[in-house]
Amino acid sequence: MLSAAASAIPRLRWAAPPRNQSARNQWLLLRRRSLSSSPPYVTPGIPAAAAAAGSGALEPPDLPRLANAARISLSPEEAEEFAPKIRQVVDWFGQLQAVDLESVEPSLRAGTAAGNSLREDRPETFTNRDAIIESVPSYDDPYIKVPRVLNKE
């Protein structure tokens, strides 16, 4: 039982972290954004007009900043080697900006309606249990012994 002094102390509550939006909601928000507004692919520090002037191409990332974010160190030779490859990948993603999504209906998975297409999760009994037990190399009733997966020493 709490004392009178302890019950008089206000209880602190932790603020709940903001909930992340689902991927579908994020996609819908991006889809609703008009093409005339600031494009979502503009990198910070680059004006939207400069990005739009690049004929829809994405700006290649700053390689030292990217390496720092990935927690890797690159020598100048490695940076020289990877720069064209990264530029090529960024160009591939830049081509996605030309895809017309206005006529595409949103769906959770390709080829399905926006709904639950999964079967009901209910237990089913397996009728041929003996066939499984016969094919198992090591069986100790009621357990099936399997080799160790993690090598903990």
UniProtKB/Swiss-Prot annotation:
One Gene Ontology cellular component annotation held by this UniProt entry: chloroplast
Catalytically driven reaction(s): L-glutamyl-tRNA(Gln) + L-glutamine + ATP + H2O = L-glutaminyl-tRNA(Gln) + L-glutamate + ADP + phosphate + H(+)
GO process terms (BP): glutaminyl-tRNAGln biosynthesis via transamidation; mitochondrial translation; regulation of translational fidelity
InterPro entries: Asp/Glu-ADT_sf_sub_c (IPR036113), GatC (IPR003837)
Keywords, alphabetical: ATP-binding, Chloroplast, Ligase, Mitochondrion, Nucleotide-binding, Plastid, Protein biosynthesis
E.C. designation(s): 6.3.5.-
Source taxon at top rank: Eukaryota
A molecular function (GO) term: glutaminyl-tRNA synthase (glutamine-hydrolyzing) activity
Subcellular localization: Mitochondrion; Plastid, Chloroplast
Subunit organization: Subunit of the heterotrimeric GatCAB amidotransferase (AdT) complex, composed of A, B and C subunits.
Miscellaneous comment: This protein may be expected to contain an N-terminal transit peptide but none has been predicted.
Family membership: Belongs to the GatC family.
Record PANTHER family: GLUTAMYL-TRNA(GLN) AMIDOTRANSFERASE SUBUNIT C, MITOCHONDRIAL
Role this protein plays: Allows the formation of correctly charged Gln-tRNA(Gln) through the transamidation of misacylated Glu-tRNA(Gln) in chloroplasts and mitochondria. The reaction takes place in the presence of glutamine and ATP through an activated gamma-phospho-Glu-tRNA(Gln).
This protein's name: Glutamyl-tRNA(Gln) amidotransferase subunit C, chloroplastic/mitochondrial
Lineage of origin: Eukaryota, Viridiplantae, Streptophyta, Embryophyta, Tracheophyta
